Amino acid sequence: MKKTILSIILAVVATVTATAQIKVEVSETVELMSILARTAGYQEYSMDLAGQYTKDTEAWFAPYKEHVAVVLAQDIRAKYGIGHERVMNMAIHLGIDNGKIVLIGDRAELNNGWQNVDLDDFVKRLNKFYKDTRFHEFFEQHRQFYDDYTKMYEANVMPTFHPEWYSQFHYGTAPTDRFHVIINFTCGGNSYGLCSQLSGQPRDLFAIIGYWIDPALGRPRYDASVLFHEANHPFVNPLLDDDKNIKLMEKVGPKLLSLHQSSVEKTNYPDWRIVINESLVRAAVVLYMQDAGYKMEQCLNVLGLEMVQKGFPWMFDLVGTLRYYTAHRDQYKTLNDFYPDIARCLEQYVNDLERKTGKTIN
């Protein structure tokens, strides 16, 4: 009995400590890459929902729309599809050393289009953009603005975030990764979950959360479920890099993509692999909320939103399947071990739908 009580106390202390150690940050390289993308006309970085900060950004950087770095950013978007999380993938692989932008980490992690880019030339032009625009001066002028919001986010959202849940849910182990929560003041309603690995260091997990002002409220809006969502991506996305798992999903994936695209007016997900990953991440958020003690009504609201408005009508089935996984961890040590069951769940959903409608999904 004493051991049980001690274990509970130690678990609570570990949880509080883990959360307390995660400081909400602003990253100069995240803002740099985001503002470069905005100046180059990337739509997903041009939502312009940050009020006065957006106005300041436009006034400061508009004169540089013909800059060599901006022209290159436009070129690599057109040729290689660089955008969305790929921009942020570059951002987390950049550092600033004595006022100079440098690449850090493993270049092989810069894929999905970046492998086709001359990275040395890109960084050279990015340094010129950094210097010519006096970017650091802009960044420091807004330091108080950044700090005020990160403190607000820290106070209101971080107490609901339990990083140890993720390693336990996905791996069945205690946490070994390092979480970073970064506010992106340029990407508006978009947020991203990424990871990187420095040699000899724990894996770094990044939840990059978009800042936006709700026009109806006239103040910044933050939703804790966005953090819960993005924190899952570094665990879920690598599973579909495995050829074995790709083979499991390659038939049902395109059908789910077709269903998703037909159920929403506009989607940011043009590839079936993204839809599979998003499905798992969104289902995991519901389980997280259940395990974190959210009211059933709140969990059902999130589930209903994903099914009806977000274009993932199979979410109810997937949440049930993942709950089976959590109840049988003696059989499935990791989510990767359970991946064949996930594929079967999604296949069953599609088969049932085709049978009910009498139509084949293409």
Positions of predicted regions on the chain:
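Bacterial Sec-dependent N-terminal signal peptides
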Residues: M1-I22
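N-terminal mature-domain "stem" immediately C-terminal to a signal peptide or N-terminal signal-anchor/transmembrane
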Residues: Q21-I101, K310-L335, Y339
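Long, mid-chain structured domain cores
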Residues: V70-P163
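Active-site scaffold of zinc-dependent metalloenzymes
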Residues: V102-G113, T186, S191-R221
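Auxiliary, metal-adjacent structural segments of Zn-dependent hydrolase domains
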Residues: R143-Q201
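Active-site recognition of the HExxH zinc-binding catalytic motif
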Residues: R221-D242
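Post-HEXXH active-site segment of zinc metalloproteases
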Residues: P238-V264
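Pan-zinc metallopeptidase signature
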Residues: A283-N362
